[in-house]
From Swiss-Prot:
Ranges facing Cytoplasmic side: 226-319
Protein name in the entry: Elastin-binding protein EbpS
Bilayer disposition of the protein: Multi-pass membrane protein
Lineage: Bacteria, Bacillati, Bacillota, Bacilli, Bacillales
Residues annotated as signal peptide: none
Positions of transmembrane segments: 205-225, 320-340
Length: 486
């Protein structure tokens, strides 16, 4: 049994919980009473084996299971006390020792019930104190899960806030073009307004100067004329750019209005000044001149546009008529050349027919000549082939005759040799028959046994005599064969 305390002093300092100790002792007594009751029931029903064998088996089981049961009970008690108050009760240790002292009284119980009791306590121990490593792992996984959830919620909130914020205006190709165009229009309008304001203020200053000083009337008139000239140039520029930009047209109209207002102010200033009467009249005449020049320029432009339209119409008619005339001329030329070609074709067909007939006749005569030549060549080739075949046959017959003659000579020589051999064999047989005996081979006789039978010994000389007398080359003889014995 493992002890988690450093020394006895600290062990004695731990608190004692009487309630848990009483509950534990009651559970142990209840389990022991149930086991005794079950043991008595089974002992009455079962048939016992021999006494010594059962006693030995019971001792072995008690020795193995006793320590396990004590260890499990102590572990369960320690875990319960640590979970409730974090301390250990000394009485639980005493109860564990008391259970150890009470164990021998249960030696009559069968090993089966002891194993059941051990399994129950083991299951309770597994439930009561899980492994600390698993608890730590679970705790760490729970913390990781909480951190992950917090991080995910923060990221989701940031994404939602970004989605709710207004998106930036990205300058794509089309947007850049539109923005640049709008900026350009705004700049032109501002410039026109500034010019009109400057122009208007200049006119007012000229009129005031003309009204206050008679001597400065001429200078005011000159300033007014310069301003008018500048306004005329701006107005002509606006008229030329009227088709390109509507905003510039509006700006030019504002300029003209300011210009008229300036003229009115100049006339009033000229009327108030007595000495500047001539200068005022000049300024009025100069003010009327831009309108006349503007109207004249507009009329001139309209006249030029009208003339251009007429020229365009004339040019369009000429452009339409010129291709038609060219097409008519081309068609006429093609018709003329076509008629000439047809006439030439008709004349050429007649000449071609005559030439074709002459050519056909010449081809026929050539074909006849070639056919004759071919027939002659064929006859010559056939004659030459026949002569060659005859020569080949003659040579072949000669070679066959020579071979036959040679074969006949060889056959005659062979026949003569065979005849001589036969004569020799006959002579030998006659000699043997005249001076020896005959023996018929029976059973498994051989030349060695035959020599022993007739000569008394089977020496190689006697065997060789029999061979020579019968014309044998080896020792092979057969049943029923007649052998001459010399």
């Amino acid at each position: 049994m493992s002890n988690n305390f450093k020394d006895d002093f600290e062990k004695n300092r731990q608190s004692i919980d009487t309630n848990s100790h009483q509950d534990h002792t009651e559970d142990v007594e209840k389990d022991q009473s149930e086991l005794e009751h079950q043991d008595t029931i089974e002992n009455t029903e079962q048939q016992f084996p021999p006494r010594n064998a059962q006693r030995r088996k019971r001792r072995r089981d008690l020795a193995t299971n006793h320590n396990k049961q004590v260890h499990n009970e102590s572990q369960t008690s320690e875990d319960n006390v640590q979970n409730e108050a974090g301390t250990i009760d000394d009485r639980q240790v005493e109860s564990s020792h008391s259970t150890e002292s009470q164990e021998p009284s249960h030696q009559d119980s069968t090993p089966q019930h002891e194993e059941e009791y051990y399994n129950k306590n083991a299951f309770a121990m597994d439930k009561s104190h899980p492994e600390p490593i698993e608890d730590n792992d679970k705790h760490e996984t729970i913390k990781d899960a909480e951190n992950n959830t917090e991080h995910s919620t923060v990221s989701d909130k940031s994404i939602a806030e970004q989605s709710q914020q207004p998106k930036p205006y990205f300058a794509t190709g089309a947007n850049q073009a539109n923005t640049s165009k709008d900026k350009h229009d705004d700049v032109t309008v501002k410039q026109d307004k500034d010019e009109s304001k400057d122009h208007h203020s200049g006119k007012k200053g000229a009129a005031i100067g003309a009204g206050t000083a008679g001597v400065a009337g001429a200078a005011g008139a000159m300033g007014v004329s310069k301003a008018k000239k500048h306004s005329n140039d701006a107005q002509n520029k606006s008229n030329s750019d009227k088709s390109n930009n509507s905003t510039e047209d509006k700006a030019s109209q504002d300029k003209s209005k300011d210009h008229h207002n300036g003229k009115k102010g100049a006339a009033i200033g000229a009327g108030t000044a007595g000495l500047a009467g001539g200068a005022a009249s000049k300024s009025a005449s100069a003010a009327s001149k831009p309108h006349a020049s503007n109207n004249a320029s507009q009329n001139h432009d309209e006249h030029d546009n009208h003339d251009r339209d007429k020229e365009r119409k004339k040019g369009g008619m000429a452009k339409v008529l010129l291709p038609l005339i060219a097409a008519v001329l081309i068609i006429g030329a093609l018709a003329i050349f076509g008629g000439m070609a047809l006439n030439n074709h008709n004349n050429g067909t007649k000449e071609n027919k005559i030439a074709n007939t002459n050519k056909n006749n010449a081809d026929e005569s050539k074909d006849k000549d070639t056919s004759k030549d071919a027939s002659k060549d064929k006859s010559k080739s056939t004659d030459s082939d026949k002569s060659k075949e005859d020569q080949d046959k003659a040579t072949k017959d000669e070679s066959d005759n020579d071979q036959n003659n040679a074969n006949q000579a060889n056959n005659q020589a062979q026949n003569n040799q065979n005849q001589q051999q036969a004569n020799q064999n006959q002579q030998q047989q006659q000699q043997r028959q005249g001076g020896g005996q005959r023996h018929t081979v029976n059973g498994q006789e051989n030349l060695y046994r035959i020599a022993i039978q007739y000569y008394g010994s089977g020496s190689p000389e006697n065997v060789e005599k029999i061979r020579r007398a019968n014309g044998l080359s080896g020792n092979n003889i057969r049943n029923g064969q007649q052998i001459v014995i010399p």
